[in-house]
Amino acid sequence: MKIARVTVTPIAFKDGPLLNASGIHEPYALRSIIEIETDNGYIGLGESYGDAPALKILDLVKEQLIGLDPFNLNGLRAIVRGVVAAMAPASNAGAELAPGSHASKAVSNAYSAFEVACLDAQARYLNVPLVDLLGGAVRKEIPFSAYLFFKYAQHIDSPYAPDGWGEALSEEQIVAQARKMIEENGFKSIKLKAGALDLSLMHI
């Protein structure tokens, strides 16, 4: 079984004006969908960052994957390392457009995107759940957790409309956000992305 085709599709979806230690989220989150197809018709999917520097690496890697056995993950890693090493000066000079996509993580980010797609293809070929290739399931279900952010009411620049969740810059507004998540979605676990504001006396 060999990889016959690789497609990298950039996507963008709306993101709220969420605050973090490095600033504010962009109006759109950029991701990429990776699809590999083998010469015997199996398909594997993965996903990763979708900013320009990340896409450049993904596009360069995909060209070298044709003919690779999707079970050959060491070969995949060697290809990714070679691509990143060849373009290291350009990667270091580029701006980080998506959190986590800077040059120091370029190998692991690109490798993991294609690794998941290869593992998916392996599982489909073997007709087993992917989790079985990773040692087996520990449990059948995992509950979702809510994620609270300090946030503005809307993105700073026009023409972006106000965010449906409203402003959350105070203790009361964060609590209201948590209650809304619980009431509308039934969350039982809630995490807070702190560190965006200097609220040393804040108690939640």
Regions found by a protein language model. Give the residues of each.
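Structural preference for beta-strand elements that scaffold enzyme active sites
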Residues: 33, 141-145, 187-191
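Alpha/beta enzyme core
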Residues: 172-188
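Metal- or metallocofactor-binding catalytic centers and their adjacent structured scaffolds
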Residues: 37-126
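Active-site mouth loops of central-metabolism enzymes
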Residues: 143-175, 194-196
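Short catalytic-loop micro-motif centered on adjacent basic/acidic residues
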Residues: 45, 190-193
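Conserved small/polar residues in nucleotide/adenosyl-binding loops
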Residues: 202-204
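Glycine-rich, aromatic-flanked loop segments that form ligand/cofactor-binding clefts
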Residues: 115-157
